[in-house]
Each structure stands twice: as structure tokens, then as C-alpha cells.
Amino acid sequence: MIRAVVFDVDNTLVDFRKWKNAAVDAAIVAMIDAGLDLTPEQARKKIFDIYDRKGIEYQEVFDDFLHEILGYVDYRVLAAGIVAYRRAREGTLVSYPHVSLALLRLFRMHLKLAVVSDAPRMQVWMRLVQLGVDMFFDTVVTFDDTGVRKPAPEPVRKALELMQVKPEEAVMVGDWAERDIIGAKTLGMTTVFARYGDEFGTNVSGADFEISDVLELIPIVEKLSGPESHHKDTKTQRSRRRR
């Protein structure tokens, strides 16, 4: 019997790479317009090199970038980049198709929903709130809550403990086989690979199920939960219509 579903955030709920690329590209154009003497291609490579070294959530990436290029921080250029980045970030953060509908369906099945992310706490909450899906989640566990990243079992285990759910009663949904799937399987959870968010061309995910659209998760959970869960969802919808 499934009682809970745990989601990764980036590239599972939100199209993170598309969003990040758009924000960085906007910052690069603004910094060049402010006087930075570099081609967009050169700037992009150096910025993502810094992200590769220090993490994709690194908050001082443009400071480090300017230090590497100029030997100092030109605050006019830095300000132009940060403002453009933030504007683009606000306008391009979107969920994958059907995310809100899938979460609503799961919510109506009376399942507990959780997020487990390697990102910092504030960044995770900002994304959930901006997408308008924060109200669906009983539990949100971030890097700040455990100090370790997936595939270490601690983040997912903490989410299960907070929801008071056993591993065999929960499903883990994620896009990164080596992190999301392996860690959850170690705990004994059912795993679902979000192939629509896969950035690595993964051939064998090792997951129990794979989906190409988040709505495909619904029949999987219904099957694992038995007919009672589907009956609850249908009954809830009928009750709402009668009102």
C-alpha cells in the first residue's frame, strides 16, 4: 500500500536547465552591454566552469567570473548581470507539463507528498512557491536539513521519518539515476525515473518504472495502492461536482 510520493525538484518538477540557461544568457548579454569585453560563448563557458566546480546553486558565480576575467569586480558590470539574471529567472521558471494536475490527482488520493532536493532551503522554497505548488507538500527536505546530498540515504530517510511513512510505503520520483534512484532503492522504496528530465542520456536507469510525462505516475501509484486509492480519487471528484 502506497501512502506517500517523494519528488526531486530540479528537472523533475521544474525544467531547471532551461530556466538556468535562460537566466545566465540574459546576464551575459547585460554584462557585455555594460562593458564586458568577451563573446557570449566565452562568457558562458567560464560561468558554467565555475558552476561545475562550486555547484549549480553557487550564489557568487558572477563575482568569481569577473575576478577571473578582469582580476577585480567591476560593480557596474556585476549589477547589470545580477539584475538581468533575476529578471530572466522570474520570467522563465516553469514546471513541466501536467505537474500541477498530477500533484492535484495525488493529493486527492490522500497521499502524503514530499520534496527532497540537494539545493539550499531558500532556493527550493522559492521555486515551489513561484510554481504555485508549495501547498501540495507535507514535507520539504533540502541540503540544509541534512548536510549531505543524494544518493546518501539521509535526505530521503528524513522525509520518510517526518511523514511517518515506511520506505516500502513510498515512491521516489527523480530524473537523476545515480542520485535519486540509487539512494531510494537502497532504502527499499519503489522508484520512478523521470525520463523527461534526463540530461545525461541514461540508457539504464535501474528504476522500477520510467515515465515520459509526470501524469504517467498516476496509474503507477494507483496500481501499487490497489483499487481503494482510485476509488477515493473518484469519490472525491464526484463529491466536489455535487457541491
Q: Predicted regions span which residues?
A:
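Asp-based, Mg2+/Mn2+-dependent phosphohydrolase catalytic module
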Residues: 1-5, 18, 100, 104-230, ...
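N-terminal helical cap/lid subdomain that shapes the substrate entry/recognition surface
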Residues: 2-100
